[in-house]
Regions:
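Short helix-capping segments at alpha-helix termini
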Residues: 60-66, 161-163, 186-187, 300
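Histidine/acidic residue-rich metal-binding segments in metalloenzymes
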Residues: 78, 82-96, 103-256
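Active-site microenvironment of metallo-dependent hydrolases
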Residues: 1, 243-245, 292-369
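His/Asp/Glu-enriched, well-ordered alpha-helical/loop segment
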Residues: 255-315, 319-320
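Short, electropositive alpha-helical surface patch
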Residues: 87, 143-164, 182-193, 265-285, ...
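Short, acidic/polar
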Residues: 18-27, 77-86
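Divalent metal-dependent hydrolysis catalytic cores, especially in the metallo-beta-lactamase
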Residues: 10-14, 23-50, 63-75, 91-104, ...
Length: 369
């Protein structure tokens, strides 16, 4: 069995910098993807148009065959004037990180009201606001990594109400509450879902650092909500599979954003009392086969093209032109299993361990045409 997908697009990926970037940037294409939406949390973060364009140029030098969509890091230095400049230069979005919540987020935000002039400028220029949907842990308020995402959702709803024409993406949702919140919003609010959050629950990362990411995977019921919103429309009202008719339309505001986040393996596998392991799961090298594998596992393979291409491209206004739609990536089912590589070597002498290293999946890429 083979499946061909037109121009898969990953709407949330970390391609890092230096020798690590040299390793992981080609993995976007290796994993089956032709468009990548690039996160700006470098050291220092990407806060100006010039920095974003320079970063894009560095990625293009590594692999010119991918379309890179660039973003800015929301910070106090950002101005409405810079937003107008960025939009004119083709920068697509601005990423918001709550302070200290995830990798390289020390310069993140503490109050959204401060940035309302920025959001107004973004709305005027039809840019996208990408939200890391968690609030920092606070023992006095009983906020922790499990409820950080649900606790953030009132901010999402408030922003949507204040800026109804601003396109907003709640990134890497992990909870049923997040799914329901996005569903309750209008057509300008969307949500990315990662491949690994379709696999994992809390039991999979507690004690296993290579599955640890931010936001953390939650409970089985939350995972079911993520899976269900992707599968939506495949089953009729009586629970029977539509075999002889085309599936009903799925939910167009939920699509893939891998949040593929590589870290040298020693930062994932070791920690000290004053330094925890790095948060991030690396899926880029096998992303499309991995998504096919997990969707097939719960009867949602028919949603693959919508999830990895159609829905995200439509929301980001990157629909395929007629001539582009011919560029397809073909997956082949491998009943005996296709083993995921154990690790990838960085030129610095370190290595990166991918998600599900050494395990078998049922799909592999056979060609691109």
């Amino acid at each position: 069995m083979e499946i061909s997908i037109p121009s898969p697009a990953d709407f949330h990926v970390h391609l890092r910098q230096g020798t690590l970037s040299e390793l992981v940037t080609p993995h976007v294409r290796q994993g089956g993807f032709q468009l990548a939406y690039i996160m700006p949390n470098l050291k220092p973060p990407v806060t100006t148009t010039e920095q974003a364009l320079a970063y894009k140029e560095s990625l293009q030098k590594i692999d010119p065959n991918v379309e890179y969509l660039m973003t800015l890091y929301l910070s106090p230095s950002l101005t409405p004037e810079e937003i107008h400049k960025a939009a004119k230069a083709g920068i697509v979005g601005v990423k918001s990180y709550p302070r200290g919540v995830t990798t390289n987020s020390d310069g993140g935000i503490e109050s959204y009201e401060t940035y309302y002039p920025i959001f107004e400028a973004m709305q005027e220029n039809d840019m996208v606001l990408n939200l890391h949907g968690e609030i920092p842990s606070d023992a006095e308020k009983n906020i922790h990594i499990i409820n950080a995402e649900p606790s953030f959702l009132p901010h999402l709803l408030k922003l949507h109400k204040a800026f109804p024409k601003l396109r907003i993406v709640l990134e890497h949702a992990t909870t049923r509450a997040a799914v329901e919140a996005v569903k309750s919003c209008g057509p300008t609010v969307a949500c990315t879902i990662t491949a690994h959050h379709l696999f994992l629950t809390v039991d999979d990362w507690a004690g296993q650092s290579f599955n640890y990411c931010k936001p953390v995977a939650k409970f089985p019921d939350d995972r079911e909500a993520l899976r269900a919103v992707i599968k939506e429309g495949i089953y009729d009202l009586f629970g029977a599979i539509h075999i002889d008719v085309k599936p009903l339309p799925g939910h167009p505001r939920f699509f893939l954003g891998s949040d593929s986040a590589p870290h040298p393996s020693h930062t994932k596998s070791t920690s000290t009392p004053d330094q925890g392991c790095a948060a991030g799961v690396y899926t880029s090298p096998v992303l499309l086969p991995l998504v096919a594998h997990v969707l097939e596992s719960y009867g949602a393979l028919g949603r693959l093209e919508d999830f990895v291409s159609t829905f995200g491209r439509k929301f980001y206004k990157r629909e395929l032109a007629v001539e582009t739609s011919a560029k397809k990536v073909t997956l082949k089912q491998v009943p005996e299993g296709f083993k995921i590589q154990e690790s990838y070597d960085i030129a610095s002498g370190e290595n990166v361990v991918p998600f599900w290293a050494g395990k078998d999946i049922r799909w592999k890429i056979v060609e691109e045409r």
